Amino acid sequence: MAWVTPNDFDGDSPLAGIDFQRALERKAYKEGAGLVPLQKYGDFKNNVKTTDLGTITTNIKGKYTLSNLNNIFPNFIVESLIEGIEAFGKRIEHFNDDDAVLSAIETRTSSPIRITRDENFNSNIKGLIPAGEGAGYAGGITSAAIDGMKIFEEIIKNYWV
């Protein structure tokens, strides 16, 4: 997974994150010519197109094509993915094998937008409190739970009599 912040893409629109996401999805579609683009991890690290699957095969459903995923992502995402895969490889045997198969692209691990809230967690409408992953304040179940706990504490403090 790669972390992307508003500083990583152009535009001041509240939907600029969605535009960035869609641009990556279009690149993946083009790279795969409508099929799922696949690449061996060793080829990904070396920025060369995969020409054959190695010792690790894929169980992906649907049609795929061998590709170069570097053509899809900006450099900061490529570097982040390599760093993350290498870190996992130190903990999980074979995770970073050169023949490991990568596919592209999953772009929805977290909300591409963030609903703004004030110091009391309210949106621009008092009492309407955006929270968790869908509101852009979490990236998974644990951080969403923590955000929910913060919101709950604020509600108790301000609304519980």
Where are these regions (language model features)?
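An anion/pyrophosphate-binding glycine-rich loop and adjacent beta-alpha core
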Residues: M1-N68
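Structural signal for hydrophobic packing residues in well-ordered secondary-structure cores
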Residues: K45, I85-I92, F152-Y159
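A glycine-rich dinucleotide-binding beta-alpha-beta segment and adjacent secondary-structure elements
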Residues: Y64-A138, A145
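Internal hydrophobic alpha-helix adjacent to the cofactor/substrate pocket in enzyme cavities
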Residues: G17-A28, A144-V161
